[in-house]
A protein has these predicted regions:
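Intrinsic disorder in cytosolic terminal tails and internal cytosolic loops
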Residues: 1-17
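12-transmembrane solute porter fold
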Residues: 18-43, 50-69, 74-76, 83-88, ...
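Interfacial helix-cap and linker-helix signal at transmembrane-aqueous boundaries
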Residues: 46-47, 78-79, 163-171, 225, ...
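Helix-loop-helix hairpins in multi-pass membrane proteins, especially solute transporters
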Residues: 72-209
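Transmembrane-helix signature of multi-pass solute transporters
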Residues: 94-104, 183-190, 217, 225, ...
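Short helix-capping/hinge motifs at transmembrane helix termini and TM-loop junctions
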Residues: 105-106, 138, 194-197, 229-230, ...
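Hydrophobic transmembrane-helix bundles of small-molecule transporters
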Residues: 169-280, 287
Length: 370
């Protein structure tokens, strides 16, 4: 039996104890997702306040999401190295303090730097929390507890556009980040009380080269895209950064295929069904993730709508998501995965085409239904 499983603090628990841990993780997930999406409706105001183009201001969102994606693989290693308690408390503290830093930023560079720091905390909060729930819960509890954690993924994006629109309209955009402070303090207090234990085992050697190559490649790609989105794009530098990103990412992939303990085990992509699922889902999520980011920019910068009206209409994207969730299991059982996925992909493509054809004269009801 490993040291952790012998520790009474990490043995499977029943009743309110494990539920409270799951609710804590759900709260962290809610805070992370809310922060990732609430900023979208404020992009035009942020760009005006910091005197940059709306497209360039999108880096505030992109830098956060890319950093989270890059650092999530590190969370497991950090947990084994430093323990659940230390990592989760540090993650919540970093996220909360970085939120304060975002609110205090006086320049675009400062804001992006604080968003990256925010993402460092966000990348560790939820994965570590899920690991705690899996380790402490009985097998009979796992599905029910994971449902607690999944719901914030549905609720936060639903309310974020409208909440962001209201805050941006009636207060300064900096309040978008200040609302994280009380949430973070409560999360820290709960984590301090609920989370205990130490690393279950000695972690494998960290794949430092994999971290450097993947982080460098994605950073170059993100910065190059930012330059293209600027009102005065620097095409030569953007092209150079694009080339650098390709070289670094290809080198990183080759490296991770050769080492025994890579940052991300790309050898799993040799399984055809898994590889096809990853390619298909990645392309699908590119579209799904772009729509709620691009629509507020379209509504506010092109149509001239208010942040509240813009956020309220984007809200329908996520309401549709919630509305279909209860029926997904029935659809899969009745028609099978293949038919449902093909139909969903076709509907998503038609929706994206419809969004591209929107004009200021399009009826609001039609936009909401779309």
């Amino acid at each position: 039996m490993s040291p952790d499983l012998a520790d009474p603090n990490l043995r499977a628990t029943s009743g309110s104890g494990i539920r409270n841990v799951a609710l804590l993780v759900a709260g962290c997930f809610f805070m992370e997702l809310l922060d990732g999406t609430i900023v979208v409706t404020a992009i035009p105001r942020i760009s005006s306040s910091l005197e940059i183009s709306a497209g360039a201001a999108g880096l505030v969102v992109t830098a956060y999401l890319v950093t989270v994606a890059v650092l999530i693989p590190l969370s497991a290693w950090l947990t084994l190295r430093y323990g659940y308690r230390r990592v989760l408390l540090s993650a919540i503290a970093i996220f909360t303090l970085a939120s304060l830093g975002c609110a205090a930023s006086q320049s675009f560079g400062e804001l992006v730097a604080m968003r990256v720091l925010q993402a460092v905390g966000g990348a560790m909060m939820v994965p570590v929390g899920r690991m705690i729930v899996f380790e402490r819960a009985d097998k009979t509890q796992v599905m029910r507890l994971m449902s607690f954690i999944v719901w914030p993924a549905l609720i936060a994006p639903v309310i974020a556009p409208l909440v962001g629109g209201v805050i941006t309209t009636y207060a300064d955009w900096r309040w978008l980040f200040l609302i994280n402070l009380p949430l973070g303090v409560v999360g820290l207090a709960c984590a301090w009380r609920l989370i205990h234990g130490r690393p279950a085992e000695t972690p494998p050697r960290l794949d430092r080269l994999g971290v450097i190559l993947s982080c460098g490649g994605l950073a170059a790609l993100t910065w190059g895209a930012h330059l293209i989105a600027d009102s005065h794009p620097g095409w030569p530098l953007a092209a150079a950064l694009g080339l650098v990103s390709v070289v670094l990412l290809v080198a990183g992939a080759r490296h991770m295929l050769r080492v025994s303990a890579p940052l991300v085990d790309l050898r799993t992509l040799r399984i055809p069904t898994f590889a096809n699922a990853m390619v298909g889902s990645s392309l699908t999520w590119l579209v799904i993730g772009a729509i709620p980011f691009l629509l507020p920019l379209l509504f506010q910068t092109v149509f001239g709508w208010s942040p509240i009206k813009s956020g309220a209409l984007v809200l329908f994207v996520f309401l549709g998501n919630i509305a279909i969730k209860p029926g997904t299991s029935f659809l899969y059982r009745t028609y099978g995965f293949r038919r449902v996925l093909l139909a969903a992909t076709i509907c998503l493509s038609l929706t994206a085409i419809g969004c591209a054809l929107l004009t200021a004269s399009t009826p609001v009801v039609a936009i909401a239904l779309l």
